[in-house]
Regions:
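N-terminal [4Fe-4S]-dependent radical SAM core
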Residues: 1-77
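Core AdoMet radical
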Residues: 44-63, 67-90, 105-118, 134-161, ...
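Conserved C-terminal portion of the radical SAM core fold
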Residues: 159-220, 236-259
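Generic structural signal for well-ordered alpha-helices
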Residues: 60-64, 94-98, 123-127, 162-166, ...
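Structural recognition of alpha->loop->beta junctions
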Residues: 38, 99-106, 195-209, 278-290
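Auxiliary Fe-S-binding modules of radical SAM enzymes
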Residues: 1-5, 14-16, 207, 214-290
Length: 290
């Protein structure tokens, strides 16, 4: 099931995600686990497109204006995307989540975080929220390989992801859990990439996001790439692996994304990720034959 089909089924109309910035940091950046972050992560985390503003309601309204021509009579998911959005003062975070939910036409909330940042306080707030609205929690697994996890400076074990999904399923069953996976991480072969997908499926993730690795300026990954320590996936190879991945993803797991990109001005490679028309055409063909 595609995410558009899932949202249409749940809300009865078109739903568009708008990205917000809660001003969070990450235990992999503030010194709790590391100061450098994951080797592929830009200075603004995954929210490179989001201009930071303290006022959440203002962020929502500005984001809606950007996409309002694309969505008629639709609703929005408020997506707290940047860095680790369950890491910090939970009362402050909870207030920001509710500020977004109080805005007009917001159908639910999506929260991006790490598997090692789900504690009892977070579970309590997620439980309260999920009783009154749709809640989507997005976990950045990236790979099931701890060897690769160490290389990319992920700073958590894959077993911590399994534990996180388990406690989410047990304590907040209404929450829709989405798992992020990256294809093309340094030195991973096709078998490992597909193993990461199966790992998430076996953990009972509700949804999955897959993207090809891209290199941003001023990252450790950029240095590795320029020194030719690894190769990036070609478009053909990437979508070949995606097609195989879709064969092992069951129908009840929602496919939230099959490609992704960073800010063009900050991206070194691969440039094919910006050819969205061609990429979407390939994705539609793959899904049609699934």
């Amino acid at each position: 099931m595609t995410v558009n089909e899932f949202y249409k089924q749940k809300f009865g109309r078109k739903v568009y995600k708008i990205s917000l910035d809660a001003g969070c940091t990450c235990p992999n950046r503030d010194g709790t686990k590391s100061y450098s972050g994951c080797i592929f992560c830009g200075q603004n985390g995954s929210g490179d497109f989001i201009p930071f503003q303290e006022n959440i309601r203002l962020q929502v309204e500005n984001a809606k204006k950007i996409v309002e021509n694309k969505i008629k009579n639709g609703k929005y998911i408020a997506y707290f995307q940047n860095f680790t959005n369950t890491y910090g003062d939970i009362e402050i975070l909870y207030e920001k989540w509710n500020q977004a939910l109080s805005c007009e036409d917001i159908a639910g909330i999506a929260i991006g975080t790490r598997p090692d940042c789900i504690d009892s306080q977070v579970l309590e707030k997620l439980s309260i929220l999920s009783e009154k609205t749709f809640v989507q929690l997005e976990l950045g697994l990236q790979t099931s390989s701890d060897k690769t996890g160490f290389l990319i400076n992920r700073q958590f074990f894959s077993s911590e992801y399994l534990k996180a999904v388990s406690i989410l399923k047990k304590n907040v069953p209404r929450v829709h859990v989405v798992t992020h996976i990256i294809f093309g991480l340094p030195f991973e072969d096709e078998k490992q990439m597909l193993s990461s997908v199966k790992f998430a499926i076996d953990a009972k993730t509700d949804g999955i996001k897959i993207a090809s690795l891209y290199v941003l300026k001023n990252t450790v990954l950029e240095k590795m790439y320029l020194e030719k320590k690894f190769s990036l996936l070609s478009r053909e190879k990437y979508f070949s692996i995606v097609e195989k991945a879709l064969k092992i993803i069951p129908e009840n797991v929602v496919i939230h994304r099959l490609t992704g990109d960073g800010p063009k001005s900050q991206t070194i490679a691969p440039l094919w990720i910006f050819d969205k028309k061609q990429n979407l055409s390939i994705i539609n063909e793959i899904l049609k034959n699934k």
